[in-house]
Amino acid sequence: YLSLEDVLSIAKAGDANGCYEALFTLGDKPEIKWNAAKDELNKFGFNSTHQYLIHCMKEVNESMTIFPHVNPGLMSKDEINDLKIHSPSGGIMIESFSKDIYSKGKPHYKTTTKFVDLRLETLNNALEIKYPMTTGLLLGLTETKEELINDIEQMVNVSKNNSSIQEIILQNFRAKVNTLMRNNAEITNDLFLRIIATIRIFVPGHISVQVPPNLSPDINLFLKSGINDLGGISPLTIDWVNPDHLWPNLEKLSIEVLKSNQVLKKRLPIYPGFIQKEWLNEIMFEKINNIIDTNGYPKE
């Protein structure tokens, strides 16, 4: 775990650099399996990752303009209620609806928290609590076209039946050295573009479609295929989820976005259409409205 001092140091630097999102991304309750995690939590004075997460989020949210956005894995209704006090939004990736990826030798073998039903339950909990969520697919985990088509179809269905979803990330698998999947094939640009276009056509229009720009070197192609978001790009830190892939240069990226007849601009972790009292607690609603323009974006 980062210490609270480190959390605040990073968040303050982001706040000073005009960032609006402090991403809290972490393992799913590691203290259940790892004694080292439990011991460190105890050293900090907490019994669970969730308790420590809430404490860190509270400190950031109450002392800065920057907003926590959380990816803590599976979330119960009670946990989401806690998170909603200090953050405007959260996220959980579905990754794939395939059952085969849980087989021996496959990406999710022996996992217990990546089961689709459990992740869908988290999204349903968010809907009941009214907590805006990001979700998405990890493209390249499955091996057959039938599985891929099912992933797309199921994601469309989920997006139509769960109004808490504000954004769908389409993330392409990138092989990493020293991992069991280091020799696995990566998705081709042509297929990736077709998937993006299909998702954009069939998911509700208010849902943003994102492709991480540091995982897709030909981002100019993807800008024309239906995406309208590039996710968080940090001026301070590496991409800790994909540390081998550097962030793009913002000036060059802005030029590519303009070529696609769009404009690159900052946003909050919560999209403008969700900045409503039913989706936010009163204090968060007020904090957000103090810094946004009439379109729901940060004032320049």
Enumerate the language-model features and the residues they cover.
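Conserved Radical SAM active-site core
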Residues: 1-161
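Auxiliary Fe-S-binding modules of radical SAM enzymes
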Residues: 8, 62-64, 149-300
